[in-house]
Amino acid sequence: MENERITWVECPRDAMQGVVRFYPTEAKVRYLKQLMHCGFDVIDIGSFVSPKVIPQMADSAEVIRQLSPHKKGNKFLVICANKRGVDEAIDHPGVDIIGFPFSLSETFQ
């Protein structure tokens, strides 16, 4: 099978959310700008989830707000674990794609 188009996706959110020490918003923005300039089609940039559960993602809305003016064809993907997160993501003009983690395992999430 031949692909006419491959979408290049980077997922820094997955790595960042597991880091215990909170990275400053400015550091995230600097790093993500570099990824944007690499030419990724989609960047999994943050999560609209409870900051009690994943504190590293508490600033996702601000990160996206700061990065949106610099988009050059990139699309921003965010993860939402519930309806509240989806509602917040839908209201954010910088969000292009919403991912919802669905698991068949009772021990995951």
Predicted regions and their residues:
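Short, well-ordered coil/turn segments that N-cap beta-strands
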Residues: 2-6, 39-41, 69-76, 94-96
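Catalytic domains of carbohydrate-active enzymes, especially glycoside hydrolases
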Residues: 30-46, 90-98
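Catalytic cores of alpha/beta
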Residues: 81-93
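Glycine- and other small-residue-rich loops at beta-strand/loop junctions that grip anionic moieties
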Residues: 20-21, 46, 52, 78
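Active-site beta-loop-alpha junctions enriched in small/polar residues
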Residues: 11-13, 48-50, 79-84, 103-105
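Glycine-rich, proline-tolerant flexible connector loops at the mouths of alpha/beta enzymes
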Residues: 41-67, 100-109
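N-terminal small/glycine-rich loop or linker at the start of catalytic domains
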Residues: 1-20, 97-109
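Generic structural signal for well-ordered alpha-helices
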Residues: 29-33, 60-64, 86
